[in-house]
Amino acid sequence: MNINLDSAKDVLCKNILIYGYCKFQDKGCAFSHNKQLTTPQQQQQQQQIEEEEESIRQGGTAVGVPGSQRNKGAGAGTGAKAIQSNGMVNSQETQSKRRFDANSPLFQPAVNNAKGTAVTNLASKFSNLSPRIRDAPVFKPENESPISQELNSKLATSGLGSIYSSKKFNASTPSFTPTGFDFSVAAQVGNNPGSTAPANLQLQQKQPQQPQQPQQPQQHQQQQQLGLQNLNQTQLGRNLNVLLQPQISQPFIPANAIPPSSAAGQLQLHMQVQQPQAQTQPPSHLTPSSIMSSAPMSAGFYTSALPIPQGGGMRNQPPSASMYPLQYHLYAPAPPPRLAVPTKEYETDSQQLFLPNELRESLHRKNEASLQTMQHLSLPDHVNSYHSLVPIDKSYDSSSKIWPGKSTVLFKCNSNFDGNLYALRKIEPCNEIVDETPFRNIRKWKSLHNNANIVALRDAFTTMAFSNTFSSPNSSAGNEVVGANGASLCFVYDYYPNLTTLLERHKKGIRVVPITEDLLWSYLTQLVNAVAAIHAKKLALRSTIDLSKIINTTEDRIKLSGCGISEVLSFSASNANASSGEEDEEREFARLRALDIVDLGKVLLELSALLLPMNLRASLTSTLLKNLANSTKLSQNFLDVLQVLTDPSLLQEPYSFDMDQFILQYISSHFMTLMNKLQNSHDWVELQLSTELENARLFRLMTKINFIISEMPTYDLNSQNRLKIIKVFQENLFNSVGPNGKKVVNMDRVLVNLNKLDCGIDEKTLLISDKECMIITFKEIKELIDTQFRLLRG
């Protein structure tokens, strides 16, 4: 292939056109590899076109005006024809640089070619539909305000129009007027050259805000026009930049950054007042006020009420508490058995050195639930000696089914006496309680706090704290409505976080636990333990034995809650004034005790019915017992228990049910099974606790070493020499290399060396650094650490 080297350098290489690059560019390729390479003639033509466009833009009559705008046809001037031909030749270059340009010459095809007749006919086809381009009227906005017209004239006379016209996208062009732009502020800044916009904004912040009166449009326009008369070229450009910058770079302020007690007008800037109200606001579910906090309220919980500095940013504000829960579920989980590294009998792995993931997450959830607080609640600050009330009731219906005519709500609260968490149940109305007589047996209920299957009762009282004034959502601000509930009855119990009732666990929960016979025997044993202890104190549960009042704390452990409420609510003045003898009291207690036994049988029967299909869960007790005997695998012993506990003759005199005989005959053998489970659970918990036994000791040792090393530059020369040994030991402690030469996390090395250091044994160890190595015992290292730590404290 013959190539002319002189002309090849002006020819674009085909590899650039096809592939975008040429791999022979630096290896002897004779063609050009520059896409923007143009000939001198093309450069001259391009420069001439740019000069003509610049003259047209400045409003002058250039020689190069297209011929189609002067003379239509072949009689155009020679200058116009030359310009038109040059524009057609360089149409591709100009199109690549200016894709959309309103100032480009109008394209007019030549009529002296072979297809000129067709083009002429096509042009004449639409000649009657629209006027000529040169006769088209200039577009002017209909609703253009006098302010924008005045600004256009100012910009045209000041020479800023040519500067702004060279920019493609500029908010300061004459045809653009930002919404809500206040030119009166620009006039004030222009009259005071030494002042700036932030200073004026600060003055406006100090002035008390008055209700804004609607201003007349004409008066407002006159004020703005008077302000524009004092603007010159330099002040106009400076003021536009000063006033437009806060609109663009205004920092976002959360909705709850201003406490309710602070004045709302102190943080509102002037430009924010002028903004339209249809501004985009963040979603309500992303604002911090709608998120439940995971930390207790403290002095640092609330955001600062100080004005935000003009320098931008909120760095100087005090850090607030974390608004999101702990990410305890992000721990590395244990691998499945098929992926676990096989270990020998005498070997162990890091998973066995710490708590299991399930137990750790369960404890984290309980701690998180204990520390949860809720903001902006219309609840009293203090109820008797308790504060920080948080509703924890999962039911949206406050009306009680156990105590008809009453509404009940459950709260979590803190005690002023010991600082512990308690569960406070509010019951209202309680207008029938007029003195302390209904609370005469509360001391007996408090004495049952040692029973493992009863939620301990701590306090009972009536209060007017919930009947204080509260704001009505339909009333205007400041109007208050007096609560009509009157006094409220409150019972305080021990608090168990993240608990569930048996109704939620087995019947109406999201993930119900299936019922088994072993589980039923366990529930029966624990309920009998609680009922027997209550009856031994000459007390009765009455209507408290219900699936919604039996809570599940851990695994299969249950507790009776709500004890003592039915007794207080069922008390009446007639009972207190009635003179009844001991025989009547014994007969009444026997009747109440029989009611408790029947309620216990109903609870077990309701749980046993969950083993049957829906069509076999009859309402009659006798039919349900037959279906359980025919359609389930329950043992005959448990069916006999259900038969005894649901016998209608229990509610008939002489109320001959004997609890001790029932325990010996039916439940004694299952007490051993329950005790075996409890002992195994106790041993497992103790084993898991032993894995965390040494964590505190080793953590204190590592903390002591880090404190000593952090103060290394402040010691003298002798101390630095001793400190150098400690630093080398720390580096060797966490510097483990695997067989492939890469660093590994050797947990065994860290634990073994820290335990040896804590004991101070005489074993020698080799410490290696970049420049030296030393042999020293753990006892000497421990003495150095203790000495340096005493110097640090002294």
From Swiss-Prot:
Name the Gene Ontology molecular function terms of this record. ATP binding; poly(A) binding; protein kinase activity; zinc ion binding
Residues annotated as binding ATP:
425, 494-501
Q: List the disulfide bonds.
A: none
- Biased composition range(s): Polar residues: 83-94, 189-199
Q: Please cite one Gene Ontology biological process associated with this protein.
A: nuclear-transcribed mRNA poly(A) tail shortening
User: For this UniProt entry, what is the primary localization, expressed as one broad class?
Assistant: cytoplasm
Record keywords, A-Z: ATP-binding, Coiled coil, Cytoplasm, Metal-binding, mRNA processing, Nucleotide-binding, Zinc, Zinc-finger
Q: Where is this region: Pseudokinase domain?
A: 372-668
Tell where it localizes: Cytoplasm
Compositional bias annotation for Low complexity: 200-226
Q: How does it assemble?
A: Homodimer. Forms a heterotrimer with a catalytic subunit PAN2 to form the poly(A)-nuclease (PAN) deadenylation complex. Interacts (via PAM-2 motif) with poly(A)-binding protein PAB1 (via PABC domain), conferring substrate specificity of the enzyme complex.
Q: What is this protein called?
A: PAN2-PAN3 deadenylation complex subunit PAN3
Task: Give the gene name.
Answer: PAN3
